[in-house]
């Protein structure tokens, strides 16, 4: 008799957990799941318990004999797991708000995965994911780690390079949304299109073809420039790309490229929100509160439509499909973060890239793109250098490397203010940055203070 699968979700109190359950329920005939463990920390106790009750209602309504467990002991959950998914946020949403508001208080972009905010999310997350990997080596050495904790590419690279854990795939919802929306914009069957993606997490481009091999990239570009929905995530302001630039490159940039191709306008929009309705993290906090009120309803046994308003919608469904592809050796085309292995010849073989892959029992097999045009090549090499410095600084706590990563980042103007933002973020996140302990103590002796009043209120409440 086939053994039922054990799935562990670290960060089980996420608002996306019902979407994860929906994805597993939809695939139950292919994935014989027996038990799901939702792991969280004490601060997330209320949310994970709400999620667990709703998840159990969803499974019961579907008529499947699957038991949902909750634990605050990660090691208890990991014992003999088959698949581990990660969707945790170190420091909770309050940390995201700090990541956004401190840079914006100095007129720099504050964003969850880009600029200074993205670097600090990596600093907080990488030590934790490496601890998880050490537990997995002992407790579930044959399990696959499916990561969709942001910044997904850097976290995945840390797992594979520093954690020495090869059975890891990083996921992102941005390619998934593009491949859902572009066929609608072109009024064609999704099964009639072939995609090829190349780049890094939240920094990739793609081309589109029909089944006869005819390129349709320019038609998607036309649809995008005409204002049609081609898959912009809900959390990104829809500033149009310059048509001349996009048509010349004949590659479809991802939504996050707006932060780089229209930096001025994206910064202006972020500053406007910062000064009025609050940053995206503050807005998401309100959205999450409403979602969890819905989840409390004892009669709710399906994913509510309101969840699609979150910027990370469809992450979870991608995770379920990835697990399905590995377990059943389906050789499914997906866009994931994995080892380069020559797919992008201008980057090192062991770099983690986000490219088209075929997913099966051996994991992800990347599809080679070949040489890139000068602009895309230059962007990727600079961004990868920034990522490598960020990851090494996250592991070592090296302040100079952290400053190097800031200097390399296109969204952080170098100079005194950049150093000030780095220092303030270190102080703001000191409870989650043990690797920077000596640096933070030095900054505190120098009386480094935080300018933003909202961040100061959050820190006071944390005490």
Language model segments and positions:
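N-terminal Rossmann-like dinucleotide-binding module
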Residues: 6-39
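Rossmann-fold dinucleotide-binding core
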Residues: 18, 144-213
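Glycine-rich phosphate-binding loop and adjoining beta1-alpha1-beta2 segment
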Residues: 26-63
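Short, surface-exposed basic-aromatic patches at helix termini and helix-loop junctions that form
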Residues: 26-29, 56-60, 138, 157-168, ...
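Short acidic low-complexity segments
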Residues: 67-80
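Redox-cofactor binding/interface segments in oxidoreductases and associated redox assembly factors
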Residues: 79, 85-86, 147
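Rossmann-fold NAD(P)-binding glycine/threonine-rich loop
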Residues: 90, 94-162
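Long, compositionally biased stretches enriched for glycine and/or charged residues
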Residues: 187-463
């Amino acid at each position: 008799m086939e053994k039922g699968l054990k799935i562990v979700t670290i960060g089980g109190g996420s608002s996306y957990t019902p979407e994860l359950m929906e994805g597993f329920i939809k695939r139950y005939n292919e994935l014989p799941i027996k038990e799901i463990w939702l792991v969280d920390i004490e601060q997330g106790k209320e949310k994970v318990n709400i999620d667990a009750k709703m998840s159990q209602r969803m499974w019961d309504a579907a008529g499947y004999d699957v038991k949902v467990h909750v634990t605050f002991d990660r090691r208890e959950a990991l014992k003999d797991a088959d698949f581990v998914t990660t969707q945790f946020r170190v420091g909770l949403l309050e940390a995201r708000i700090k990541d956004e508001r401190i840079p914006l208080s100095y007129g720099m972009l504050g964003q969850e995965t880009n600029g200074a905010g993205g670097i600090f999310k990596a600093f907080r997350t990488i030590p934790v994911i490496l601890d998880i990997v050490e537990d997995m080596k002992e407790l579930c050495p044959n399990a696959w780690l499916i990561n969709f904790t942001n910044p997904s590419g850097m976290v995945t690279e840390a797992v594979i390079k520093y954690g020495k854990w090869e059975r890891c795939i990083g996921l992102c919802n941005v390619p998934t949304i593009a491949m859902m929306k572009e066929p609608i914009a072109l009024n064609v069957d999704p099964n009639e299109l072939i995609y090829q993606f190349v780049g890094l997490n939240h920094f990739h481009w793609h081309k589109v073809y029909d089944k006869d091999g005819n390129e349709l990239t320019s038609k998607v570009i036309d649809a995008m420039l005409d204002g049609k929905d081609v898959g912009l995530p809900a959390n990104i302001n829809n500033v149009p790309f310059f048509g001349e630039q996009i048509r010349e490159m004949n590659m479809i940039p991802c939504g996050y490229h707006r932060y780089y191709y229209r930096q001025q306008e994206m910064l202006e929009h972020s500053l406007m929100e910062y000064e009025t309705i609050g940053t995206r993290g503050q807005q998401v906090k309100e959205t999450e509160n409403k979602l969890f009120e819905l989840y409390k309803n004892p009669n709710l046994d399906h994913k509510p439509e309101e969840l699609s308003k979150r910027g990370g919608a469809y992450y979870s469904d991608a995770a379920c499909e990835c697990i399905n592809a590995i377990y059943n050796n389906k050789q499914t085309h997906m866009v994931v973060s994995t080892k380069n292995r020559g797919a992008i010849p201008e980057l090192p073989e062991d770099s983690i890239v986000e490219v088209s892959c075929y997913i099966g029992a051996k994991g992800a097999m990347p599809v080679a793109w070949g040489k890139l045009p000068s602009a895309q090549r230059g962007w990727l090499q600079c961004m990868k250098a920034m990522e490598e410095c960020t990851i090494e600084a996250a592991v070592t706590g090296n302040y100079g490397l952290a400053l190097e990563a800031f200097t390399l980042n296109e969204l952080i103007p170098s100079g005194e203010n950049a150093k000030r933002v780095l220092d303030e973020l270190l102080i703001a996140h000191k409870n989650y940055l043990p690797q920077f302990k000596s640096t933070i103590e030095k900054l505190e002796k120098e009386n480094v203070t935080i300018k933003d009043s909202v961040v100061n209120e959050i820190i006071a409440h944390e005490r």
